[in-house]
Amino acid sequence: AEMRDKSLTPGQQVDLLQKQYQSRPAGEPFLFIFSVNYFPAIAEFCHIAQIPYVCWTVDCPVLELFSNSIKYDTNFIFLFDYAQYEYFQPQNPDHIFYLPLATNVNRWDQVLASSSGKHPQDQISFVGSLYTEKCKYNNLKLSPYTEGFLTGLMEAQLRLYGCNIIESVLTPQVIREIKTADRHFYAPDNTFANTDSFVAAHDYIGFKLAETERIRTLNLLAEHFDVALYTRSDTRLLKNVQVKNGVQTL
């Protein structure tokens, strides 16, 4: 069975798994349960049923990885981002692994061969999100002091390559203000560490940095080259970039 609805609550996820588990042919075990990204409720179910749980992340951050359930010996957690791997691997060294994202090379070879002569004519093409639709930071109502502090911090980070200073520089006061400004701030129970500073740094400021950097980079490139962007994001801040519709990758 395949679970496609991302909006299922943890309880609904477990109910679906339990129905599949109970409806299997008598005496036929599950080899393993697989998911894209990590779901604590699935890990709990697999641990109780003693079924291997295999997952592979495609996002960063995946805040559910802070759950104490990542420590179970029934988990086989593959993380695509090396910094993500370094952060979480010590919590379960024998069951958390580094595995970059992959693709079906043979399939793409066939796609390229069948589209001969139909390649875009732009000098530079990008496919993907600007993060404008994902950036929760844009909806925060912050004090002038905090807004100025964070603007300066983000400008400093944009000039630094190879290191991330955001989380280490955030003060408790700034973290509290971000948390208070969004009633949907992610604050899970049963975690192995306090997640507030990580969530503020990565789920709010990190997304804002990604949005800012992508828009600035595209605008700078468009001053010198023909640039096309295939996206479904809000592109009003782009200048001289040829905006195309989003593309289907699967």
Language model features by range: what are they?
Residues A1-Q91, N106-A113, Q242-L250:
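Extended catalytic core of nucleotide-activated donor transferases of GT-like folds
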Residues D94-H95, P100-L250:
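Nucleotide-sugar donor-binding catalytic core of glycosyltransferases
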